[in-house]
Structures are given as structure tokens and as C-alpha cells.
Amino acid sequence: HFFPAFYALYLSLFDTNLFGRWNWVGLGNYAQLLQDQDFLRSLANTGKYVLGTVPVGIALALGIAGLLNQPIRGLASYRTAFFLPYVTPVVAISIVWTWIYKEDSAGMLNAVLSWFGISPQAWLLDPKWAMFALCLMSIWRHLGYNVVIFLAGLQNIPAEYYEAAEIDGAS
């Protein structure tokens, strides 16, 4: 299982071409990579995406799982509603979110914002909003799966622990 990763690392230490000529460059490829502005911008965007989706997605999923762990009416319907985006094909989700983020007032999000006097935004075209829009879509897409995982964990906590916590005054 580790061979492909180590072989790729080994290959990265060479400069190659299509004719099989291999020149040892050591860490030169990595030095060149760290000077490439496109790579650095991509690295920064990846960091923003991860920081914008992982903590928010986990906190939101844990909160919803906590709410769904309570004895409420129609619990199966709520679970289905939250899990449905995860099993929906990515193409369908992309089409729906493109419609939501449409640039003019025909977009659902811009239509709602116009009710509050906020001018339409180009959500996917404006660099200051595009990352936010993609993070929001990604959080929504994976929320159901994360809720199911957290809910399974919460439901496996023995009732005695809840009783002990209540006796100890935990809220």
C-alpha cells in the first residue's frame, strides 16, 4: 500500500522527459514549486476552503445530531431530509446551486436578499464571494453524512452516562 506513495516521492526527485531521460535534481522541484505564484495561491485557497468548511461543518453537524438525538416526533423524516443531499448526484446539486447563486435577481439567494434591500451579488464570479459560496455549498453537501456519523456515535452512548451527567449537574 505504501509503495506507490514512496515511488512518487522518489520520482519527484528527478527531472524527466518523454524520452526517458532522468536527471537528478534532488529537492529542486520542490524549491521551484515554492517559488511558483500559482501554486502558492492554490495553497492559500485550499487553506481557506479547509478552514471555511471543516470546523463549521463539524460544529453544525454535531449540533444537528444533538438535536436529532432527542425523542422528537417524525425523527426518521428529519434524518432523511438531512441525509438526502449526500446521496443526491453531484451534477444535480451543481445545477441547483448554480440556480441559487445566479448573478441577477433571478437567482434565489439574490431574490431573497433583494427583499432586505441588498443589491444582487455575482456569487460565483466575484473573487470576494466565490470562496464563501463554494464553502456553503460544500458544507450543505456533506452535512447529512456528518450528522449520521455523529448521531450514530451519540446513540451509542449508554443511558447510564447521561444519568450520571444529570446527577453531577451537567447541562
Task: For each feature predicted by the language model, list its residue ranges.
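A structural signal for multi-pass alpha-helical bundles of membrane permease subunits
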Residues: 1-171
